[in-house]
Design a protein with these regions (language model features):
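A conserved regulatory-domain signal marking ACT and ACT-like small-molecule sensing domains
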Residues: 1-151
Length: 151
């Protein structure tokens, strides 16, 4: 089963992110993960939401350009070298990562690495054949957030 993220090209100026989150909030779409990157006057917002197709529809209805991108979410060990193991396998198989980011989860004491690649099916086959677990959209939406304790 495929997972998706919303990728939104944006101008680098105040209130853009708030405009996007407001639209999604009004439609009761929950944001599970967000990354924001800018380069000069523009950038991208990547969102994993609980209903990506409805999120895309809501944003487009408000005139916001948005792409629904297939992603692979991989469960990795949260330890030094955990991400490197995955990336070395993908490198050996010549899989180019166009976009990627990760986050730690408490429920499994692991991390999730999100990959955006051109050939997701082949990349997912390589990942699974190497013993890594990929998360279904349902598993992704049910992740409990990691809570830092003991500041």
């Amino acid at each position: 089963m495929k997972a998706y993220q919303l990728t939104i090209p944006v101008e680098n100026k105040p209130c853009i992110l708030a405009q996007i989150t407001s639209i999604l909030a009004r439609k009761k779409i929950n944001i599970r993960s967000a990354t924001i990157s800018s380069f000069g006057d523009s950038g991208f917002i990547n969102l994993i939401v609980d209903n990506p197709k409805q999120g895309q529809k809501a944003l487009r209805k408000e005139g916001i350009a948005v792409e629904l991108k297939e992603i692979i979410t991989v469960l990795i060990d949260d330890r030094p070298g955990g991400l490197d193991e995955l990336l070395q396998i993908l490198c050996t198989e010549n899989v180019n990562i166009e976009n990627g980011y990760g986050f730690v989860i408490e429920s499994r004491k692991n991390a999730v690495f999100v990959l955006d690649v051109k050939d997701a099916e082949r990349a997912e086959d390589v990942i699974k054949a190497s013993g890594f677990k990929t998360l279904t959209p349902q598993e992704l939406s049910e992740i409990e957030p990691f809570h830092y304790v003991g500041y």
